[in-house]
Regions:
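Short acidic/polar hinge/loop motifs at secondary-structure boundaries
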Residues: 60-62, 196-224, 582
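Transmembrane beta-barrel wall of Gram-negative outer-membrane proteins
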Residues: 260-289, 294-330, 353-371, 440, ...
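Membrane-embedded beta-barrel scaffold of Gram-negative outer-membrane proteins
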Residues: 364-368, 374-390, 553, 559-565, ...
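Structural signature of Gram-negative outer-membrane beta-barrels, strongest in the C-terminal barrel
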Residues: 313, 431-433, 439-441, 476-619, ...
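A beta-strand signature from Gram-negative outer-membrane beta-barrel systems
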Residues: 92-94, 211-255, 658, 806
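Face-selective signature of the C-terminal outer-membrane beta-barrel domain
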Residues: 314-325, 356-395, 399-519, 551-553, ...
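Extracytoplasmic beta-strand/coil segments of soluble accessory domains associated
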Residues: 126-129, 136-200
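Gram-negative outer-membrane beta-barrel transporters
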Residues: 421, 428, 495, 610-621, ...
């Protein structure tokens, strides 16, 4: 081929691939006064923000699309929507109408829903790429949930396939999994608040002891396994709690919420918010206390959050946040199957306590280099502790001997920073978006286990001198270093079809430096050996994860998407360093790896039905779990280690029917029916453990169903929700009933009915509801450690009433 031939072919190829760019500009004015309106967001209904009007109401942007549905949004005006042909829209004149001030609660809800449809995770949000990914967003205020107690069953009712531990009647900890992932403290998700990490240690101890107050959240963003490239390697993906933002129209707004409920529940949530010139702020205090629905389960919690922002100019903003949470909870202990069947709410542990002290801090810089290039820098840190105290034995039914208690203390000190640069550019005259980012994370953690007092109260001091021969004693320093570089690029093959490849490079160094005691006794209980064994370990690895996403959007109401991304989960400190009488740890335990796939369609049909229907596959290598083994002394025990290879696959769907639109009801009425279904199958495809291959995977109910009816008339709103979860196993050997430990065995199927009601009048709002209306006795969790071990029952029928006052 000659150079001339090559040039001709290249020119033809570029010509075939390219398409014209169109310049769109215009002015936005107020209909009554014809004056320009500044700070109006101009949205493409399918891809997000295109421009913002300046002080003269002017906006402009460039697009390759031939047709656009534009939405113009400002907090102080009614939303305006227009469809344009871009070839003939070089200059637009848009007028915004005044927003009616006395909106009913139904009208406010409809407006928030419309705004949400504009803001929901588009292809690009800030310095993040979501194109081609399975994404879900929870509008917390519209969930009609029991927010005072963070009722996850209600809050996440329209997120497909989530498996939730429901044993905490105050919502102090969030325990959610899904697709066969252990829900324990949400450890299989990367959990963030406003984009930064909040767990104890992202890799070494990814458990979330802190959960933001739901009353302070605007939305919860859930991105499935494809989030492994941008946010962290976990199989579950990302859960990002997005806090409420400062009120942009007032210098001061105060909201106070008072809640009373069953079993001595009392909570108060008070927030202050406002904007003055270049400064903005949002802060809240949340207090909770209660007796719990079981004996020996009282709790008290205090949580403070503060956000302060300073806007230097239209291109640069600096924000700082600080979060502090402290709570003390008495733990009633676990049950065996026989104990649960006898009395599901009994307790034989009066000396077990749990204490958390959590301090988070964050500093974020947002800078816009140009209309096409954005940069963010996030600095974050954690200074926290977690203390677990109590009488533990592998025989859950054993009466407390009132001897010394077991104490596990964990101190977590870490910091990190994450920087992101996102830019929009052209490839062969076609739109493209490139994201590059890096993250540095360093943790210095400490963990100690040993004897504590033989008293009753929450005394979190060790008593090693008094009980030198206590069996479970250890001390470990646990430093951890993680450096990662990640990138994704959206290539718009056409104005309807995009391809998004991505990568993540990870360097992980986890260390364990310390000792444990080896203590042996004779048949009479006399100590014959008390030795200290040094145990120093160093795990260092580096790897690259790859992923690919596809998206097809023929119009504003339909999208087909697909994604495949690799995942990785490193062994945690609790996997290797904690002595637990309920199970053994395999000495050969190692990291998990695999990949996640998603394929689905989502959209809206004539504003009557919104839907998200998809299939998924989750493929594991060296999955960690429990298996029943025969120990060297001939006893039957549970061992935690790498079980083998596994696959989970299924269908997830969410349909939301707008009955108001279907039956042509007036604007004073709101009526929606939703059905959220997940049908999953699973199998261990390979295992060296006897009797495991071909078994079902743990935490995989065959059917996960939630349905509900949301309605309202003017200022009155109501909700009724039904939830059903099929039976599931908790160990790889698929045990049906556990031994005296209660740790492994089946979690039976259960169903729950919840109702809630709210009424608004001027600055007041009254909310009330009943959870578990039918008073079903059920459990969702077999705890391997605290708050058990054993079966942890879920709450019986309970009520709550909340009064909200807004100033």
């Amino acid at each position: 081929m000659t150079l001339k031939d090559f040039k001709i072919i290249l020119a033809l190829l570029i010509s075939a691939l390219g398409f014209a760019q169109h310049n769109v500009s215009g002015t936005v004015t107020f209909s009554k006064t014809n004056t320009p309106v500044a700070d109006v967001k101009v949205y493409d209904k399918t891809s997000g923000v295109l421009a913002t009007t300046d002080n003269s109401g002017f906006f402009k942007f460039e697009t390759s699309k031939k047709e656009l549905t534009l939405v113009f949004f400002s907090f102080e005006y009614a939303v305006e929507e227009v469809t344009i042909e871009t070839e003939n829209a070089s200059t637009l004149n848009i007028t915004l109408k005044d927003l009616t001030q006395n909106l009913s609660e139904v009208e406010i809800t409809a407006r928030k829903q419309r705004i949400f449809e504009l803001k929901r995770l588009n292809d690009v949000e800030g310095t993040a790429i979501y194109a081609g990914k399975k994404t879900e967003v929870v509008l917390v205020e519209q969930s009609m949930a029991n927010l005072a107690s963070n009722n996850a069953r209600q809050i996440y009712s329209q997120v497909a396939g989530l498996n939730i531990y429901q044993n905490d009647d105050a919502g102090l900890q969030l325990n959610i999994g899904g697709r066969g992932l252990d829900p324990n403290r949400t450890a299989n998700f990367n959990t963030r608040q406003n984009g930064y990490d909040i767990s104890a240690d992202v890799l070494g101890y990814p458990e979330s002891y802190y959960t933001p107050a739901s009353e302070g959240l605007s939305e919860i963003q859930v991105i499935r396994g494809a989030a492994s490239l941008q946010y962290g390697t976990q199989f579950g993906g990302l859960i990002n709690f997005k806090m409420k933002e400062p009120n942009p129209n007032k210098p001061l707004e105060v909201i106070s919420r008072f809640t009373l409920g069953s079993y001595g529940l009392y909570t108060n949530f008070t927030s202050v918010s406002g904007t003055k010139n270049k400064w903005s702020y949002y802060s809240y205090f949340n207090y909770k206390k209660g007796d719990g629905f079981r004996p020996n389960s009282e709790f008290e919690s205090k949580n403070v959050f503060a956000h302060l922002g300073y806007k230097f100019n239209e291109k640069t903003k600096l924000t700082g946040e600080i979060t502090y949470m402290r709570y003390l909870a008495q733990q009633a202990g676990g049950l065996t199957d026989a104990m649960f069947n006898e009395d599901p709410y009994q307790s034989n542990r009066a000396r077990n306590w749990f204490q958390v002290d959590w301090l988070l801090y964050n500093l974020k810089l947002d800078h816009k280099f140009s209309d096409k290039t954005n940069f963010t820098f996030n600095f974050f840190g954690l200074n926290a502790s977690r203390d677990a105290l109590g009488f533990r034995t592998n025989r859950v039914s054993q009466v407390d001997s009132n001897e010394e208690r077991d104490l596990i203390k964990g101190d977590f000190k870490n910091f990190g920073f994450e920087s992101r640069l996102l830019t929009k550019y052209k490839v062969f005259n076609k739109d493209a978006t490139f994201l590059i980012g890096s993250k540095f994370y360093k943790a210095d953690n400490y963990q100690e286990q040993g004897p504590a007092s033989d008293g009753i109260g929450p005394n979190f001091d060790f008593t090693n001198d008094e009980y030198p021969n206590y069996g479970s004693q250890s001390q470990f320093d646990l430093p951890n270093l993680n450096v990662s570089v990640f990138g994704e690029n959206i290539f718009y093959v056409s104005d309807k079809f995009s391809v998004t490849p991505g990568f993540r490079f990870e360097y992980i160094k986890t260390q364990s430096e310390g000792f444990y005691k080896n203590i042996n006794t004779d048949a009479a209980g006399n100590v014959i050996l008390n030795e200290t064994i040094e145990d120093n370990q160093n795990f260092e690895r580096s790897f690259i994860l790859l992923g690919l996403g596809l998206s097809y959007k023929p119009n504003t109401n339909f999208e087909a998407y697909g994604n495949v991304s690799q995942n990785y989960r490193s062994v945690t400190f609790s996997d290797i360093n904690i002595d637990n009488p309920a199970f053994l740890i395999s000495p050969d335990i190692t990291d998990e790896e695999g990949f996640t796939t998603d394929l689905g369609i989502r959209g809206n049909f004539n504003n009557m039905v919104s839907y998200d229907l998809g299939v998924f596959g989750l493929f594991y290598k060296k999955r960690i779990g429990f298996v029943t083994i025969v120990d060297t002394d001939g006893s039957i025990k549970n061992e935690r280690g790498n079980i083998g290879d596994a696959v989970m696959y299924g269908v997830e769907s969410l349909f939301d029917f707008n009955l108001k639109k279907i039956f042509n009801l007036n604007n004073n009425v709101k009526l929606n029916y939703f059905i959220n279904t997940s049908v999953i199958n699973s199998e261990y495809t390979n295992s060296e453990k006897a009797g495991v291959k071909g078994n079902k995977v743990e935490f995989v109910p065959d059917l996960n169903l939630k349905m509900g009816l949301n309605g309202g008339y003017k200022n009155l709103l109501a909700n009724i929700q039904y939830s059903y979860l099929g039976s599931q196993f908790t160990d790889a050997t698929n045990s049906i009933e556990a031994s005296e430990s209660g740790v492994v065995g089946e979690i039976p199927e259960y169903d729950i009915l919840d109702v809630s009601l709210s009424y608004s009048y001027k600055n007041f709002k009254l909310e009330t509801g009943i959870n578990n209306v039918l008073d079903n006795a059920y459990f969702t969790r077999r705890a391997t450690g605290y708050p058990g071990p054993g079966i942890i029952p879920s709450s019986p029928r309970n009520w709550y009433t909340t009064l909200q006052i807004k100033f």
